[in-house]
Amino acid sequence: MSSHDDDHTPLLISDPSVNKPFRSRTPSPEREYCSDCPLQAKGSACNGNSHSLKHETNGASSSNNNVAKSSSHDSFKAKPKNYDSTSNSNEPISFNEPDSSNSHHNNESICNNDNCCREIARRRSLSPLLILPLNFINAFSWGMIEIPLLFLLRQELCAIHYNLDPTQLSPDDPICRLAEITTGVSKVRAAFGSLAAFLGLFSTAYYGTMGDIYGRRLVLFITVSFLLLGDLWLLYQSYAPKHPYFVLFAAALKGLGGYISTVVASQNSFVADCSKTEFRAWYLGLNFAAYHLGTALGPSLSGFIVQYTPHMYYVFYITSTFWIIYLLYVWLILPESLDVSESKEQQNKISGFSSIWRSCLEPLIILWPRSLCTEESCEFHQYDINADTHAGRRHWDVLLAAILISLTLLGAGSMGLLPLYTDYKFGWGPMKASLILSTDSFASSITLVALFPLLSKVIEKIIEKLYSSEGLFEDPSRADNTSSLQGIRNVFSYLVRPGYSRSSILRGRTADEKYTIVKRDVWNAQLGYAIALSAAVLLAVAKSDVALFTAVIIQAISNMVVPCVQSIALNGVQSEYNGRVLAAFAVFEAVALIIRGPIYAFVYTESMKVSYPNMIFFLSAVIYGCCFIIIFFMRLYRPLNRKR
């Protein structure tokens, strides 16, 4: 391979449409690549010029742009290059034989001229903010049913305890404030969440793969239809309260719709499809901010209805209406973020699973780091810059991120019992219990919209100062962040800026930029877990209303960890795997939701026997401590320098 050829050969990354994928390589400032169009070089589709990189099968070169001059067969069998971490040259190495290499370049199905990049440009120009109204509606509807569901169960169990008709009791009747009734409510509520999450575990993975093939809109429409049916059943139950276990049918309907995880994962996939790499964490943060805003307003309204109106079923009328609005928005307004014109082979993959169990486990394959290297080719479905060696080192960030997200949900299980805890220990009613949940969600929204981007910008500046002596940040593409006030401006610009501006569509990511993004998110996550641990301890020792509200506000600041961890993981995979990664995360979330209800119900019941109901918060503190330790094992995307 000639030196001239080395200087201009495009950097290639593995792609599912390529039979023998190339090695992922460190991009250099002179040769940036289109990560979504692996066979397009800088100066071609990335810059608007539609010339393809084709090698003629007879060994001669037909490119008049000096893109790829073919060399003889003997040059491919030259002495292998030596890799060394002290050299600054960035020469790409192909492990493919000439014939197979030519076949890759001649495969027009991979990227027919600039058609591939044109499609990526189209969906990157979609604004991730289009999903925010749906995220709000989803969270608002889920938030509204939490307080009514708890007090509906409390009313029905209290009627059984006193052998009364449920209609003779008000939802917040003081005679129902007994330890055995409170623990009974926690058990039924745990069964509700576990059943829905268990069914969601099997449906979420299937919906995730379906979303990558048929598009996000179809998945959202199907899943929300099941959620609507679940709320209609709760509406019937609130009209005529029966046995508390009748509400489990609503849990089954919601589970068939993927429960909470599928809708959230599909919404996050839309954000990942349409957002640029360096803005992805902030857009995911805005997504979570909209979610927390909905969970803030929902409990407040439902708590007011339960406490000050005689009819609890008003709540479920409202939630059913909002789900209908959600469906209309998806049908009439939301654009599709993916090109759904996939091959029949891929479409058969989603319909030809031998079992539901296999469909559940299929997306989890993306979490396992795979590196298969031979003398001819290397295949990476996950990649990092460190892994560009003959040996091919695995990187575990995606799997660790899935574990962290599931543990974070598990640690948050104590917040679900907070209304029961405050009702029993402090004598709060539905309205006050809903206010503390709303406070948590409002504080989370402010954190993710304002505090998180500013903190990220400060940490990014610190990283630049600490590591500038190593030359990691001397890249011209970073010149757009010259002012220290840019972080403040970004708070507002993130609200209106689309995921990709036309001027920067498909600009390649350099090693310096990726290193900065990942290390910044790692530091944010470490800080968030430390705050979560402290807040859980404060909740456990709180003796007054003021102390409880203060601890909840501090705990809300830690909610930035989820978008940070997701951003770390998504920066470690190719963009075409975003949907599968988030679907795999949703499976882990479903597992956490399955087990956290019974775990916290058991701990709460046992601690009530010894008059220590605050043990649930100490359990959360232990879980957050484990997360704080795990985050230190996540690897960074450091540049790998080579010499010939």
From Swiss-Prot:
Transmembrane regions: 131-151, 190-210, 218-238, 245-265, 286-306, 314-334, 398-418, 435-455, 522-542, 546-566, 583-603, 614-634
Coiled-coil residues: none
Keyword Membrane listed: yes
One GO cellular component term noted in the UniProt record for this chain: membrane
One GO BP annotation of this record: transmembrane transport
SUPFAM superfamilies, sorted: MFS general substrate transporter
One Pfam family it belongs to: MFS_1
Principal location listed in the UniProt entry: membrane
InterPro entries attached to this UniProt entry: MFS, MFS_trans_sf
Annotated membrane topology: Multi-pass membrane protein
Biased composition (Low complexity): 58-70
Segments of skewed composition (Polar residues): 83-106
Sites bearing Phosphoserine, chain numbering: S28
Region Disordered, annotated ranges: 1-35, 48-106
Protein name, as recorded: Uncharacterized membrane protein C14C4.07
Organism this protein belongs to: Schizosaccharomyces pombe (strain 972 / ATCC 24843) (Fission yeast)
Biological classification of the source: Eukaryota, Fungi, Dikarya, Ascomycota, Taphrinomycotina
